[in-house]
């Protein structure tokens, strides 16, 4: 047993984390490392993967492009015997659906949806057999609103996680972590405006810590911060026609 930064005890084992080189994924890696887990770190960026592995110590790197079916196979194999699976890898497309190419859209879905499904399918059987396991799928509050392919993919991740949580044994936990705006490289890479009011922005370390804590105790939907919990409640119960109008206003 080992304690994490939040002080909670956790069973030591192996954790596979996709997209750990920055932001929420990196902070989740640090939290699970602090709890005593051996880490398998997965990303396209081999250099930054190795830098993080060197920082954390008990970690191995598995460079892979999760949008590539063949490159994903070794990751699926590695996921078959882990205690924690963290599906965090993700990115956004700068162009709208009408401006992007179908190849861009397909690659996005391969990372945000297909890899989540396939890695989860690989990891779950051993977790169920041993009677213990944790799957933390990083989704987003964007999944509550109709903002194109990214939002649709995150809606899938959330509903997928809820369905699995209802079907798995008691000590195999599946959690969808649904943060709001979080200060990471994600928004810079997607060329998004990050000049919004300060109250909108969350700290990646706090988001990661809350997600790990909630997954460990069996919370199915983890929405860090009271303000985003309130906004999520409104979005989930608002008329769909109203949300479509909000989406239209955003595109103008």
Predicted regions and their residues:
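Conserved glycine-rich cofactor-binding loop
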Residues: 21-22
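Conserved glycine-rich Rossmann-like NAD(P)H-binding loop of the short-chain dehydrogenase/reductase
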Residues: 35-51
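Conserved NAD(P)H cofactor-binding loop of Rossmann-fold oxidoreductase domains
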Residues: 88-93
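Substrate-binding pocket helix/loop in short-chain dehydrogenase/reductase
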Residues: 96-98, 104-109
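Active-site helix of classical SDR
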Residues: 120, 153
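Residue(s) in the substrate-gating loop at a strand-loop-helix junction
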Residues: 140
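SDR active-site lid
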Residues: 159, 165-230, 241
């Amino acid at each position: 047993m080992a304690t994490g930064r939040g002080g909670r005890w956790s069973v030591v084992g192996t954790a596979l984390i996709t997209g750990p080189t920055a932001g929420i994924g990196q902070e989740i890696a640090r939290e699970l490392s602090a709890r005593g887990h051996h880490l398998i770190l997965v990303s396209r960026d081999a250099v930054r993967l190795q830098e993080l592995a060197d920082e954390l110590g008990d970690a191995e790197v598995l460079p892979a492009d999760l949008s590539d079916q063949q490159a994903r196979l070794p990751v699926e194999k590695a996921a078959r015997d882990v205690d924690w699976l963290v599906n965090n890898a993700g990115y956004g497309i700068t162009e709208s659906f009408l401006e992007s190419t179908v190849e861009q859209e397909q690659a996005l879905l391969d990372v945000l949806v297909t890899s989540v499904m396939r890695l989860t399918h690989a990891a779950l059987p051993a977790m169920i057999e041993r009677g213990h396991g944790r799957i933390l799928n990083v989704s987003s509050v964007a999944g509550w609103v109709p903002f194109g392919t990214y939002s649709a993919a995150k809606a899938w991740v959330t509903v997928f996680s809820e369905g699995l949580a209802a079907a798995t044994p008691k000590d195999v936990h599946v959690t969808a972590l649904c943060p709001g705006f979080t200060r990471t490289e994600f928004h810079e890479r997607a060329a998004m405006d990050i000049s919004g009011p300060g109250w909108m922005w969350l700290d990646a370390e706090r988001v990661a810590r809350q997600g790990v804590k909630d997954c460990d105790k069996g919370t199915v939907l983890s929405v860090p911060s009271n303000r985003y919990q309130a906004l999520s409640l409104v979005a989930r119960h608002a008329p769909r026609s109203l949300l479509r109008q909000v989406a239209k206003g955003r595109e103008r």
